[in-house]
């Protein structure tokens, strides 16, 4: 399986690691790293430690974070995106919910992938249609996330998965109707977006099989999430090893991509998962 993303064709027969570069002061990264998380020094380390894709965001999606305007978001992103485009060979992904920021980054040629992470102020169908046409015209990759929460309702895992499938089926069909190449699309079940901590843990292992019938690769974004903290009883700054353990499980269950803060540990997880899968067959 291959992922067509603007100037790159990413071979997903080998599971891939998307590294998170948050250029924002209130993200999970901001107090967990040995250097300033928003610095190019940090980005260089991510690339050297095994990142296949660099996912850059300037607005935190963690619980309790402060929303930012698209103008502030673009101001934060400008220099990191220029640096990434000129200093790394990795495909560049934009992590954003703002329509104006997504259109700006595509029009400037800064990014290869749009990682659309959430609800914005625009009407959903209108906003997503504009994004999908812009992605189509740029030949960019697209990550479709099930970012709708479940309204505080505690659902069984089966009902949780059903809601995720319905959300992603709708977004996938809308993207295809707007001309996006299916080979450019990856699906994300939206771990940590109001689905319940127990369900989040189960999604790490079971989302790839639950979404397989949609015919797109699956990305698992579990890094430093509350579900891991609850499971192992550790604070967020101690969650990189549990994240890597979960990455190995996700890879072995069919995930094509994991999105993580520390790619080096998930690189080991990938090696173990590939070896175990090979010997199991």
Predicted feature descriptions by range:
Residues 5, 28-38, 42-45, 61-83, ...:
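Active-site-adjacent loop and "lid" segments of alpha/beta metabolic enzymes
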Residues 11-19, 23, 45-58:
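N-terminal glycine-rich anion-binding loops that anchor highly charged ligand groups
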Residues 44-48, 52, 169-184:
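Phosphate/pyrophosphate-binding loops at sites that engage ATP/ADP/AMP, CoA/4′-phosphopantetheine
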Residues 1-12:
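N-terminal carbohydrate-binding accessory modules
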């Amino acid at each position: 399986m291959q992922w067509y993303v603007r100037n790159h064709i990413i071979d997903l027969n080998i599971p891939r690691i998307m590294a998170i570069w948050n250029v924002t002061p209130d993200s999970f990264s901001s107090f967990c790293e040995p250097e300033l998380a928003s610095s190019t020094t940090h980005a260089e380390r991510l690339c050297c430690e095994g990142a296949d894709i660099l996912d850059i965001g300037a607005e935190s999606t963690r619980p309790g974070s402060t929303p930012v305007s698209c103008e502030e978001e673009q101001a934060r992103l400008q220099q990191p995106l220029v640096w990434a485009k000129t200093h790394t060979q990795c495909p560049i992904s934009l992590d954003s919910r703002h329509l104006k920021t997504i259109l700006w980054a595509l029009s400037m040629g800064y990014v290869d992938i749009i990682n659309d992470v959430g609800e914005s102020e625009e009407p959903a169908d209108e906003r997503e249609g504009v994004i999908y046409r812009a992605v189509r015209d740029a030949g960019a990759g697209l990550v479709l996330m099930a970012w709708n929460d479940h309204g505080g309702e505690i659902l069984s895992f089966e009902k949780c998965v059903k809601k995720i499938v319905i959300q992603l089926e709708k977004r996938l069909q809308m993207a295809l109707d707007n001309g996006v190449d299916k080979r450019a699309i990856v699906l994300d079940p939206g771990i940590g977006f109001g689905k319940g901590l127990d369900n989040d843990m189960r999604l790490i292992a079971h989302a790839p099989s639950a979404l397989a019938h949609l015919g797109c690769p699956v990305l698992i974004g579990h890094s430093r999430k509350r579900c891991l903290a609850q499971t192992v009883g550790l604070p967020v700054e101690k969650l990189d090893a549990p994240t890597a353990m979960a990455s190995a499980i996700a890879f072995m269950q069919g995930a094509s991509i994991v999105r993580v803060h520390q790619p080096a540990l998930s690189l080991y997880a990938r090696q173990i998962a590939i070896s175990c899968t090979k010997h199991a067959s």
